Regions:
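N-terminal leader/targeting and accessory segments in enzymes
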Residues: 1-87
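Phosphate-binding loop of NTP-binding sites
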Residues: 4, 83-148
Length: 148
């Protein structure tokens, strides 16, 4: 993943920097991860930056002044590291749905939804259907109450 896709307010020079995951516990850092050094009430994540780097972190998000590359590590400075972690996590793990089809009307909604589901599924698209008949995915069907 390229860091520029997830961090909009950084210098253009940093946008093509690669990362493979995120962590805020230095023990869980792996190669090419971003380490978020969060300052808490009792523990300061800045004290674990060296450990995160030794585990493979290539990017450090912290609240100190320096921003840039140092010894092959990219340091990004933000006032609220906890907020940046939340925003980045959301962008990585909950990307926006690219396409959403809604069917409204008096009659035939379930049939139309089923037709769309079949057409999209046959065309190798990621698809799910939620309606009166429940939740339908490639993994199976699930009966649901109160879908309308």
């Amino acid at each position: 993943m390229l860091i520029g896709k997830y961090f909009k307010k950084i210098k253009p020079d940093f946008r093509s920097h690669y990362f493979s995951g995120i962590c805020f516990n230095s023990k869980l850092c792996e190669k090419n991860h971003i380490f978020f050094a969060i300052k808490g009430n009792e523990i300061n994540g800045n004290n674990y930056i060296k450990h995160a780097i030794s585990k493979g972190a290539k990017t450090i998000v912290y609240n100190k002044k320096f921003q840039g590359f140092k010894n092959g590590i990219l340091y990004l400075s933000f006032n609220n590291v906890r907020k940046i972690l939340a925003e980045t996590s959301y962008k990585i793990f909950f990307p926006k749905i690219k396409n959403l089809i809604a069917v409204t009307g008096t009659n035939g909604k379930s049939s139309i939804c089923n037709f769309y589901y079949q057409i999209l599924n046959l065309n190798k698209k990621k698809v799910a259907s939620l309606g009166t008949l429940g939740l339908k995915t490639v993994f199976g069907n699930l009966q649901m109450l109160n879908t309308t």
